[in-house]
From Swiss-Prot:
Subcellular location: Nucleus; Cytoplasm, Cytosol
Function comment: Ribonuclease which is part of an E2/17beta-estradiol-induced pro-apoptotic signaling pathway. E2 stabilizes the PDE3A/SLFN12 complex in the cytosol, promoting the dephosphorylation of SLFN12 and activating its pro-apoptotic ribosomal RNA/rRNA ribonuclease activity. This apoptotic pathway might be relevant in tissues with high concentration of E2 and be for instance involved in placenta remodeling. May play a role in cell differentiation.
Cellular-component GO terms for this entry: cytosol; nucleus
Protein family according to the UniProt entry: Belongs to the Schlafen family. Subgroup II subfamily.
Organism whose genome encodes this protein: Homo sapiens (Human)
E.C. number(s) listed in UniProt: 3.1.-.-
Gene3D superfamilies recorded: Schlafen, AAA domain (3.30.950.30)
InterPro entries membership: Poxin-SLFN/SLFN_N (IPR031450), Schlafen (IPR029684), Schlafen_AlbA_2_dom (IPR007421), Schlafen_AlbA_2_dom_sf (IPR038461), SLFN_GTPase-like (IPR048729)
Protein name: Ribonuclease SLFN12
Predominant localisation class: nucleus
Entry comment on modification after translation: Phosphorylation at Ser-368 and Ser-573 negatively regulates the ribonuclease activity. Dephosphorylation is induced by the interaction with PDE3A and stimulates the rRNA ribonuclease activity.
Phosphoserine carried by residues: 368, 573
Amino acid sequence: MNISVDLETNYAELVLDVGRVTLGENSRKKMKDCKLRKKQNESVSRAMCALLNSGGGVIKAEIENEDYSYTKDGIGLDLENSFSNILLFVPEYLDFMQNGNYFLIFVKSWSLNTSGLRITTLSSNLYKRDITSAKVMNATAALEFLKDMKKTRGRLYLRPELLAKRPCVDIQEENNMKALAGVFFDRTELDRKEKLTFTESTHVEIKNFSTEKLLQRIKEILPQYVSAFANTDGGYLFIGLNEDKEIIGFKAEMSDLDDLEREIEKSIRKMPVHHFCMEKKKINYSCKFLGVYDKGSLCGYVCALRVERFCCAVFAKEPDSWHVKDNRVMQLTRKEWIQFMVEAEPKFSSSYEEVISQINTSLPAPHSWPLLEWQRQRHHCPGLSGRITYTPENLCRKLFLQHEGLKQLICEEMDSVRKGSLIFSRSWSVDLGLQENHKVLCDALLISQDSPPVLYTFHMVQDEEFKGYSTQTALTLKQKLAKIGGYTKKVCVMTKIFYLSPEGMTSCQYDLRSQVIYPESYYFTRRKYLLKALFKALKRLKSLRDQFSFAENLYQIIGIDCFQKNDKKMFKSCRRLT
């Protein structure tokens, strides 16, 4: 897999470069190298999974085939099917764009609200028996299976036996097949072409492989069948029986059987398991080779494998789920994956009734004027547009007094904004848990209706490093809005960098909006929900408490329009403090 993080991108996004990819339905159908087509599909799918689990971003693919046109040729059915296998509703998460010789896939962050799952998974690699089939559990089934195991702290290796005998009537059940398979397993000799007295079921699987590819085929199928039987109720795998349920057997020397038994043991012992119980036992199985005789002469063998049901969870291989960590695309470890699947998400106060309750006990001084008047007086600095909320007011005033030209610059920048909130900070980077840049004068985050958030960075030192600072801050902010704040819509954060000279002159040194293009859906943001998500993210990061008084500035951060349903409650809360 050749996926790398593009560190030179202009986007304030996680951009994953998947290399050269052939695109278009006809072109992908005509690819002679099927392995290459599969590898390209795998790389795109893993990159998508990694971005979904890492706050969203962009997949960048260099277009392999000449004269490709997205509008004429499309993407390719195999890729589209992979997208559908990952996502229930593809348009909710993905947007596609061709930019010259590059194809870009914009990926929105995974949303817990969509499926109830905290992460995206390409394959759980947890198998189960569904009557006569071994099937991999989808993420939802895996979640239920793991939750049940965690709740019960595992299970007994064997099903409890019935205490009372049932009436002996002419009833046939699956357990009859399992019992007959057990009798067959205990035999020492078999007759060629002998018919079985049982068939495939939840507890029985029958296979017939040619001698030439016997070892290879057993190694290929063994993990999924062992996982399926162990995760269900145990069962038997018989190799050397045909579709007509006749005993055929395979030819082998004794040394071949020894090698085969060692490979089976090696394969089973390296299968990943996860325990919720205290015993932490190994997979319990028995392997034997039953001699097949034709008119009294040994002519082959049947491989018989009995797998006991397991106490906890058995994987065929590690879960196929990815994320971006330390600028690398990495597969989640089994432990990480299970924690994301079954551990409860920490709950943080997000209801405004709870927020109001905090205000009642947190406000340091009484307010005798009505809430709306208090809101108006605290929101707007004199001389600035009433369409924009500026906060925190004290920092805003101080910056305007200390730095000539900043107020005029802000007025000019906000002139075209219909309605918005401009939130100042000495360092948004520090607020988000990143490293401080002492050369930065301040940052300001603009959140307005139907327009992407804009992060303004102001500095008084000529230095090119501010682009990296601003880009990283914007990227982190976007990720926090989605993963911590719970913002479920598509969003991007634009950046703009200004230089303020000691004489009060200002100049724009960088404007991301002139450098990159996003799909249309990224420009229609919801200000109200962005502010809510921002509040939740900062509250969890404790930036609100660290930067300025939590209660005193709560309304300024969220905005009065977000509280319209609770105006009466808030008014009463404030009045009780007088």
